[in-house]
Design a protein with these regions (language model features):
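A motif-centric feature for acidic-aromatic and gly/ser/thr-rich catalytic loops and repeats
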Residues: 272-275, 427-430, 442-511, 517, ...
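Membrane-active amphipathic alpha-helices
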Residues: 538, 545-546, 551-555, 564-568, ...
Length: 769
């Protein structure tokens, strides 16, 4: 029950699987359509019914998701290779992208929907060093000994010209303190057309975008960054070659609220804003210090902590209002009675439909909506019509665009695979490659494909055509405001590679929307933070005011803010366990799936990953690769356990060097030890109950026959999930081998016997040191 009186009720089955979510308003009346779930005998979700329709899910014998059907009956399929790598994704229209890997499971070749190829090269530590696209452009990446990106160079393969270069310097804590960016600016060149010659050779009327070879304007910008004792960004000083020196100053209070921002050009103050907050750290007023007596912009919130109104009194603008779902997801943004943006989410709170004010009459105008008659859910409702009903006719009616998002949920963070219009045609589709910098490779539109270029923060800085024409170039300030370039379309992918809505200026970060202008979210974080670091207790600030070194792709807690290069460490080691699972006997599928579910719970609870762990994680992948398909004896498992312990020790030693991050993580784990314990116990008990239901009486004496082991170890910022079909002796030997590391650790093992059908849950939890 929320402060406003809104209530969400959760109903579970006897195995603790969520069956239903229902919503009531403060009066106790149903406020939204219930969400219902169904599962198979292995505990895998097979369907979800919500306001967007009924979604269904299919799995293979190893519990990997192979097909997702959306509420609008659009299918996305997944294919895997023998090493458990994702081999292909099939889109709803039948097109597909395919992946090829080297012996270390590094992605080396990506073939997109149009059969265009992107290739990758890696160094000895399995880090991406080179990306070559089908249009001939190439990206080269360099690293230092601490795994920081030191240089990114984007070049045109056909002409050899450098499109952009980004160089970075770091302090002892691993934070960026210097940056040099050299970039071509997307522009135009004069080209004669038939109309030009008809008009007596006037070549001034029509232009097209210049390709890299003919692009002349190059901009070099140097930036330095300063931080306070809490590692909050306090100053950015930038100097464009031949241009002005610009200083951006930020100040904060003790809890991390921004109190002022000032922009100074060549020593002259050009802009200054002051910020005021209430006791809940909610921004309630922003004033322009350059305007005497400025009434400013005021902000109002509901009882649940959601921003509901923004009034720009300085410019006497119409108020902007915000409305939310029962689970506090942004639903509608209006200004002066006109809908700017509206969104609809599925039962997992993934954005599925969106209505945007574009002044284009392609989908709806006033009360008239162009939607195919067959686009209805099982109960006769049309999600698109529900969104379109928000548009009012009359003098304020504008043109609106309806978009359906087909999401890839088989990723760490849900990403959009394709966008459909109300006419059920694909507007654009996206291709994803190697995780980390530049993960979103290209966008495929009806006319042609375009390729994204990125800087070291994973922000989109350029867009190239198939012929290497630079059509767009972008620059951002530290908090994500677009300072150079023009945003195209309804939503564009820019700062940190995430989607920003053009009309509202809000960036969609899945659980919440981010306002780059103020450096705050529109809703409070559901994560409470840690007691050790007060800045994590601020539930509205962005990345604890350290946006250069952290991102927040989920809209949640500090540990999900660590950039993807660090997260790759956890993902790499996690895949080791998945490979061992694939060698296990399929007859124990039920236990494996339930064990994997427990591991996932721990991983989601403790997501912090120290950057210095990546190299060790990659090394561990190579170690495990050599025995991937030969895990058949106890001696082999003992070798794996030994090497795994060595890996964990190396990670433990490495992360202790990063000081504050390591200390904060220990506190985070310590506060959640009880939570982790209860979750592990719950899932292990669920395993026992599930097996008991299927196979009858448990024979505790048969535990030595065959075993399934799961070890989920969190080591100061590294989450390792390894699930495998181990012999009972190997499991028992593995626990003490991994338990004496003196670091935050959670390990669980489900040991079973197939012949006599018995299973035992073992839980070992040691407190963080």
């Amino acid at each position: 029950t929320q402060a406003s009186g809104k209530k969400t009720t959760y109903d579970y089955d006897k195995l603790n699987d969520l069956l239903e979510k229902s919503y009531q308003d403060a009066k106790g009346e149903t406020s939204e359509k219930d969400v219902t779930y169904a599962y198979n005998s292995a505990g895998e979700r097979v369907s979800m019914k919500d306001q967007t329709g009924k979604s269904s899910y299919e799995y293979d014998a190893l519990g990997r998701i192979t097909k997702v059907t959306s509420g609008s009956k659009k299918d996305v399929s997944y294919v895997y290779d023998d090493a458990d790598n994702l081999q292909a994704i099939v889109y709803p229209d039948g097109t597909k992208i395919s992946y090829e890997y080297d012996l270390n499971d590094n992605l080396v070749k990506l073939t997109d929907r149009n059969r265009k190829v992107t290739t990758y090269k890696h160094d000895a530590l399995n880090r991406v060093t080179e990306v070559t696209r089908s249009n001939g452009t190439k990206t080269e990446v360099s690293y230092d000994a601490e795994d920081h990106i030191t240089k990114i160079v984007n070049t045109c393969g056909s002409c050899g010209k450098v499109i952009s270069t980004y160089e970075y310097k770091y302090n002892d804590q691993g934070y960026v303190v210097g940056e040099t960016a050299t970039e071509l600016e997307a522009g135009t060149r004069k080209t004669p057309s038939w109309e030009d010659w008809y008009n007596w050779g006037d070549t001034q009327k029509e232009t097209d975008k210049a390709d890299c070879e003919h692009q002349e304007k190059e901009i070099q910008t140097t930036r330095t960054y300063e931080y306070d004792d809490n590692w909050e960004l306090t100053r950015c000083t930038e100097k464009a070659e031949g241009g002005k020196k610009t200083v951006h100053n930020y100040t904060y209070d003790k809890i991390g609220n921004r109190t002022s921002y000032e922009k100074i050009e060549d020593g002259v103050s050009k802009a200054k804003y002051n910020y005021k907050y209430n006791d809940s750290n909610q921004l309630i007023k922003r004033t322009n210090a350059k305007i005497w007596g400025d009434p400013g912009t005021t902000y109002s919130y509901d009882k649940d902590g959601n921003l509901i109104q923004e009034c720009d009194k300085t410019n006497s603008a119409d108020p902007v209002t915000y409305e939310y779902t029962a689970e506090n997801r942004l639903a509608v943004v209006k200004q002066g009675g006109t809908v700017l943006m509206a969104a609809m989410y599925d039962g997992d709170n993934n954005r599925v439909f969106e209505l945007d004010n574009t002044y284009k009459w392609e989908d709806c105008y006033g009360d008239e909506v162009l939607i195919p008659a067959n686009q209805r859910t099982e109960d006769g409702n049309s999600p698109k019509e529900q969104l379109a009903s928000l548009v009012k006719g009359g003098s304020n009616a504008k043109g609106y665009t309806l978009t359906e998002y087909i999401n890839d949920i088989n990723r760490e963070n849900t990403e959009v695979l394709a966008e459909y219009g109300a006419d059920e045609k694909v507007r654009q589709a996206y291709t994803y490659g190697e995780s980390g910098i530049g993960e979103r490779v290209s966008v495929d539109k009806s006319e042609e494909s375009s390729y994204y270029l990125y800087d070291g923060r994973n922000s989109v800085t350029g867009i190239l055509t198939e012929t290497a024409n630079l059509t767009n170039s972008y620059q951002y300030d530290s908090y994500g405001n677009l300072t150079s370039g023009t945003a195209d379309g309804v939503n564009y992918y820019g700062y940190n590679g995430e989607s920003t809505n053009v009309k509202t200026g809000l960036q969609y970060l899945r659980a919440r929307y981010y306002n780059a202008e103020n450096g705050t979210f529109t809703t409070e974080d559901s994560d409470l933070g840690t007691t050790e670091n007060p800045l994590t207790r601020n539930r509205y600030d962005y990345t604890t005011n350290n946006p250069l070194n952290y991102s927040d792709p989920t809209g949640h807690s500090l540990w999900s803010r660590i950039k993807s290069t660090a997260k790759k460490a956890a993902k790499a080691v996690k895949s080791v366990g998945k490979k061992i699972v694939n060698t296990a006997k399929k007859v124990v599928k039920t236990v494996v799936n339930t064990a994997k579910k427990a591991a996932k719970t721990i991983v989601n609870t403790v997501k912090g990953v120290a950057k210095t762990a990546k190299n060790a994680a990659k090394h561990a992948k190579q170690t495990y690769q050599s025995v991937k398909n030969r895990v058949t004896s106890s001696s082999t498992y003992q070798k794996i356990t030994s090497r795994g312990s060595q890996f964990i020790r190396s990670v433990s030693n490495g992360v202790q060097k990063i000081g504050k991050t390591y200390t904060s993580f220990k506190s985070y784990v310590s506060e959640r030890t009880a939570e982790i314990r209860s979750e592990v116990v719950r899932h292990m008990c669920t395993t026992t109950n599930r097996i008991t239901d299927k196979l009858g009486k448990v024979d505790w004496n048969a535990v030595k026959k065959v075993a399934i082991g799961i070890t989920a170890v969190t080591v100061s910022g590294l989450v390792v999930a390894a699930t495998g079909g181990l012999a009972a002796g190997a499991v028992l030997a593995a626990l003490p081998a991994m338990g004496g590391l003196g670091t935050a650790m959670v390990s669980g093992a489900v040991i079973g016997a197939i012949g006599g059908a018995s299973y035992l849950s073992l839980i070992h939890i040691s407190e963080p040191t």
